């Protein structure tokens, strides 16, 4: 006899659960049997009572239950979580070998069956973001197990910094906060600053104040891809953030790189990272609004750049704003295509799950038609494999990345 409260769901919810999707929405629940508290484990069953899975419940969330297992034999003790952590770490050691393992995403939420949990590694600091109550109430166990496993494997980890300063936690009935997590056995972690090496390039990372968890790891191999074709090019890197694409282009032999961001802090960090790597004679930061800058360059009929990189923030974070996002993506891509000479190169991407691949591709077709150019595709890429895409969970696929030659 199982001890968990039962949640009976609709046939629609049953179909989604059987297909492997871990989210049970509030409107899919028909009745419950037993008592529970938010954050508890509950069983999800069909309307006829057939077991579908076990997950975390939270009445504050539209996603009422987040499934973590479909195995009735699982016991959700420390051994269960340790097995799951080791599985995730072993996967990263396979797909992010050598030095890449010191700078990668260790846990990618639902794709690793840790719903609502992200853990990034930046050299000797782990950064975690917890967006589900079920993980929140178990994080002491999970984080200490993760620390133990990494230390056993010879990895030097001085602390875990929590970046829970995101409003989505409020929708889950949790508070916003950030700060060091107190491991059961660890020395004082010190300053929330570290240095990472990605693709042979060194960066300062501020895990306390940087965007999201401090540095965008999902473009690691896309940066390598643009470096291969940057030699001798005059590059315009738009929405540069910490200058990662700009620095990879410079390291690849670019003649000159202009790294643009609207944030003065981002431009300062880009310049500092360029100096750190001896690339400050090639990379120059520029504080500007990318939309305005591209318009100005088009109006001036500039032919200054023969390689343009567009890595904008997510223009849409919900299905209701996709149409506006398409207009924004089209505007910057159209202007970039107009600026590039025949034979020039364009790297462009979208990091929004809601901007579906087919929509992004159609937008690029429309922009190319309006610019009266043809696009020769060099590569179609996605997020790096430490951000794995679980086919049963389309929300885990979000980054679309293309490299074209304009012909």
Language-model regions: role of each:
Residues 304, 331, 345-407:
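C-terminal catalytic and target-recognition region of SAM-dependent MTase-like enzymes
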């Amino acid at each position: 006899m199982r001890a968990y409260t039962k949640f009976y769901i609709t046939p629609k919810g049953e179909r989604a659960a059987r297909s492997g999707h871990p989210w049970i929405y509030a409107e899919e629940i028909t009745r419950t049997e037993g008592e529970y508290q938010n954050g508890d484990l509950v069983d999800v069953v069909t309307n006829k009572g057939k077991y579908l899975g076990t997950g975390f419940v939270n009445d504050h969330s539209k996603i009422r239950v987040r499934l973590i297992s479909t195995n009735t034999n699982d016991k959700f003790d420390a051994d269960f979580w340790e097995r799951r952590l080791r599985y995730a770490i072993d996967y990263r050691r396979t797909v992010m070998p050598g030095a890449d393992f010191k700078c990668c995403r260790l846990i990618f939420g639902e794709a690793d069956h840790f719903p609502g949990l992200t853990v990034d590694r930046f050299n000797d600091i782990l950064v975690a973001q917890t967006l589900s109550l079920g993980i929140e109430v178990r994080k002491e166990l999970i984080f200490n197990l993760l620390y133990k496993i990494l230390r056993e494997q010879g990895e030097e980890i001085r602390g875990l910094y929590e970046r829970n300063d995101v409003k989505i936690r409020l929708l889950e009935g949790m508070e916003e906060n950030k700060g060091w997590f107190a491991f059961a056995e660890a020395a004082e972690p010190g300053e929330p600053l570290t240095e990472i090496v990605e693709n042979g390039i060194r960066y300062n990372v501020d895990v306390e104040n940087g965007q999201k968890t401090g540095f965008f790891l999902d473009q690691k191999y896309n940066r390598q891809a643009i470096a291969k074709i940057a030699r001798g090019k005059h590059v315009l890197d738009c929405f540069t953030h910490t200058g990662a694409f700009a620095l990879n282009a410079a390291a690849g032999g670019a003649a000159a790189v202009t790294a643009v961001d609207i944030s003065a802090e981002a431009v300062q960090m880009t310049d500092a990272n360029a100096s750190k790597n001896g690339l400050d004679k090639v990379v120059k930061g520029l504080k500007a609004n990318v939309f305005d800058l591209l318009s100005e360059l088009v109006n001036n009929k500039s032919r200054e750049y023969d390689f343009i990189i567009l890595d904008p923030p997510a223009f849409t974070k919900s299905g209701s704003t996709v149409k506006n996002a398409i207009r924004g993506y089209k505007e910057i891509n159209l202007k970039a295509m107009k600026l590039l000479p025949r034979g020039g190169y364009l790297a462009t991407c979208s990091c929004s799950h809601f901007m579906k691949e087919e929509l992004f591709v159609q937008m690029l077709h429309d922009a190319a038609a309006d610019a009266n150019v043809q696009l020769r595709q060099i590569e179609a890429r996605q997020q790096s494999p430490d951000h794995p895409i679980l086919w049963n969970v389309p929300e885990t696929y979000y980054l679309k990345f293309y490299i074209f030659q304009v012909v």
